[in-house]
Amino acid sequence: MKKLFSVITLLASISAMSQQNVFFDRSFWNENTSVSQVKTAIEVGNSPSALNEAAFDAPSLAILGNVPTPTAIYLIEQEGNSITKTTHDGRTYLFWAASSGNVALIHYLLEQGSDIYAKDTKGYIPVTFAALFGNTNPKVYEAFFRAGIDPKATYDQGESLLLKTIAFDSEQLPLTQYFISKGLKLKQTSLSGATAFDYASRKGNVNLLKTLRKKVKPTHQALPMAAEGVIRQPNNPIEVYQYLIENQKIPATATDYKGGTALHYLARRQDLPAAQYLIEKGANIEATDKDGNTCLMNACYGNNLELVKLLLKGKEHINKANGKGETALLIALQRSSSEVVALLLAQGADTRAVSKKGVNVIEALLASYNPRKKGNDKDFDQKAALLKQYLVALQGANAHGDTALHMAVVKGNLKLVEKICSWPSIDINAQNEEGETPLIKAALTAKDTSLLKLLIDKGANKALTTSLGETAYELVKENENLQKSGADLSFLK
């Protein structure tokens, strides 16, 4: 009876999780998810091989959810899945097994012939992906070494696995000792000369640093590396910066091989208290890294208004552009809040800024639109109102003659297009340098007819042509999505 009740409960929960694939719901996966639960979910129509919008499938999400190894193996062996299948960021299942530290699953995948040298889109291979996420179990690395990975191999900036993982090690250095037993040296350095001490600073463990200091010297890179931190970890405690600056005498202006200062990384991490401390100790607010990024630009990727205020004390750098031609305002319009945008505009940010790719303030604004993000719709409207307040012509065009409506149409978001259509003075029939109207753009790019019908309903002229004399109706025949759908397109005539 208990077993029957469990099955009924599972079926009910699957039904309640809407029509989407239940396997895409991360709450489905945990240490107790059994093969029988997975089988039941498959029987009622959930696909074990389909990819979600982020290119994760059931096996990858299951592995990340730390399911029992038999459950993961069962999923991997389903039709449509294989050891060579790539998921999010081009990663095979071996990447996910390595990052989660599932040694048994790693062995299974290796026995099945999974490629230990496969690279994801970020340049990682499975063993370095394990190191990236701070895996400290020697058995994980031993499995890869036995499969053919050279323990002494170096990656990226000449970093060995010892350097990559030392920040995650405990003060007794068990993992580091394991790597030393494989022939690695504690005193080895990266291509930039960064030491094991420098790499250890990334996790902010002062006691670990004190242990290592007896054996390895720091370089100035330790400070920016501490500020950069490690992936998916909270900000480091302020004590690590105090130790490095006051005890190890590393200057607050120290840079890493990318030219980044600690303040650059603290700004990106939105760490206001540590940023204040660094500035008190002499950090340069106006420093630029090798890509031309200022600390202010980095702060504009987040929403910490007080941090932006702190970094605006050096006003003369507000309109600096980085190597991509992006200014703090262009970044803030895309990535930050309307409050940050308002502050930048009040302090003299130039609304005429255009990146090297031709992105102006209007296109930067449109890039920020994400209706799935809570509060985004209101924030978007407030940013648009601010630009108008500072005399930006919202109906204006970029260097190629594209208006906000042209740009919105290419994004294909119906709500965004409707919003832009409501802007005063927007010309729904404006033509760019190729003679394309928003309707013609939509004819070429739309995935269904709803966008085209919306534009016509708002007054789009179907008779207008491109510089080559082509109408929207003639060009829609080149739209594979619409042609495959078999949709009636006669309304464009």
Residues of each region from the PLM?
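N-terminal signal peptide c-region/cleavage motif recognized by signal peptidases
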Residues: S13-S15
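Conserved hydrophobic site in ankyrin repeats
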Residues: A41, L75-I76, L109, F144, ...
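Solenoidal tandem-repeat scaffolds enriched in leucines and small polar residues
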Residues: G134-D256, G260-H264, R268-R269
